[in-house]
């Protein structure tokens, strides 16, 4: 597989202008067939846009996928789901890249909307797929049942708390944050803006989809652990509506030279984590 170094492509201002509406999407019902919008390709697609010099958004209107550019290839955070893998590949091409340069696909947790496209990317691109050991087990157990079934990726790399992955000039650090799933994996990575480099985080599983007291404690403990490992400067959530990704993209498109980067906001990140603790306490 080709492992060419990534090119730095100018920001897609026109694409940013189109990516304006932040989605607030309810969780799917038990019967996925009641939600035809999930497979409405034209309605769900969004043009890709650059967030930092080395980070771009290549996801949908309701579920995120981030492209990290390194000196030795590309990394994806999350894999979307079918029928959107071709949309994802088109978004990568629109940024001036060859999808064959994707070396790793990091899956934040094993639910269908984040892991469902990993098998196709693994097959088409030869990319290595990374998940936590617990969520590799989750995918093996649950991907073939129910209305959200999907073809799982072949089990590949299992990374855990504190482990790192380096590709070229970029190192990712993984934080195991169980709660949303038993193996939700948060990803820390550098976000570069000119001469500045910021600490960015994609939290592994934000939603509280349970009410069991022990699971709520596990979720809260994970959030506190991330807070202790901060501060983090940039909050790039795996659902864009969780942290106003599209409105911030609008602000970024209007940014003037010398103005602060709208996605860099350690206080907002800290408030987001405190809000997750409050949500768990009230669940």
Residue ranges and their predicted role:
Residues 269-283:
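C-terminal regulatory/interaction regions
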Residues 11-21:
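Bacterial N-terminal signal peptides
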Residues 22-29:
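Bacterial Sec-dependent signal peptides at the C-terminal "C-region" and cleavage site
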Residues 74, 80-83, 155, 164-166, ...:
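Metallo-beta-lactamase
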Residues 55, 83-86, 93-164, 269:
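Active-site HxH/HxHxD metal-binding segment of metal-dependent hydrolases
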Residues 54, 68, 78, 109, ...:
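Divalent metal-coordination and catalytic microenvironments
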Residues 42-95, 99, 186-206:
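Conserved beta-strand hairpin/beta-sheet module of binuclear metal-dependent hydrolase folds
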Residues 1-12:
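Bacterial N-terminal signal peptides that target proteins for export
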């Amino acid at each position: 597989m080709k492992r060419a170094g990534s090119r730095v492509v100018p920001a897609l201002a026109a694409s940013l202008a189109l990516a304006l509406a932040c989605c607030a999407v309810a969780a799917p019902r038990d019967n996925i067939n009641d939600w035809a919008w999930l497979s409405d390709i034209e309605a769900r697609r969004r043009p890709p846009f650059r967030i930092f010099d080395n980070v771009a958004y290549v996801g949908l209107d309701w579920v995120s996928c981030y492209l990290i550019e390194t000196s030795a290839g590309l990394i994806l955070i999350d894999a979307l789901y079918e029928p959107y893998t071709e949309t994802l590949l088109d978004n990568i091409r629109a940024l001036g890249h060859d999808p064959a340069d994707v070396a790793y696909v990091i899956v934040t947790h094993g639910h269908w909307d984040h892991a469902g496209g990993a098998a196709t990317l693994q097959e088409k691109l030869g990319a290595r797929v990374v998940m936590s050991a617990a969520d590799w087990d989750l995918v093996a157990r649950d991907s073939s049942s129910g209305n959200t079934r999907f073809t799982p990726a072949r089990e590949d790399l299992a990374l855990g708390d504190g482990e790192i992955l380096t590709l070229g000039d970029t190192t990712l650090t993984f934080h195991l944050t169980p709660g949303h799933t038993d193996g939700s994996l948060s990803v820390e990575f550098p976000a570069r803006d000119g001469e500045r480099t910021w600490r960015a985080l994609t939290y592994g599983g934000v939603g509280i989809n349970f009410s069991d007291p022990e699971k709520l404690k596990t979720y809260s403990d994970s959030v506190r652990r991330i807070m202790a490992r901060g501060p983090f400067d940039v909050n790039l959530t795996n659902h864009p509506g969780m942290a106003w990704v599209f409105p911030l993209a609008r602000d970024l498109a209007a940014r003037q030279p010398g103005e602060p980067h709208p996605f860099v906001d350690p206080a907002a990140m800290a408030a987001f984590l405190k809000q997750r603790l409050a949500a768990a306490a009230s669940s």
